[in-house]
């Protein structure tokens, strides 16, 4: 079972199973029976993305490396950074401090928005960095330098 959501920028899901399970699901899953099939353009897009995924290994490796580098730097600086993905939160704490830090990063050219209550619990305001494979090592180094300021 898997989905085609965020990971490949599409919609829908799939299941790989034996024929007997397929028949069972078709005949017993009312929610499945009464759903609408995906439009052909969605299926074509998903196929197009899936065909290209193997060639993107280098980009995935780079994204993992810069994500780990940023997480390590934030942790070393004393920030709580609970993340296992390329979305890296820098938990600052107080809303006011988070806003000031975000504004400082923005003035230096980084797209950094504060995330505050009620989106997150009181006292856990943060800046959430959504990294992409297009971000360079140099840019991450600049960000870390600013954070370490």
Regions of interest found by a model, annotated:
Residues 1-84:
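Active-site C-terminal subdomain of aminotransferase-like
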Residues 115-116:
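Cytosolic Rossmann-like ligand/nucleotide-binding regulatory domains
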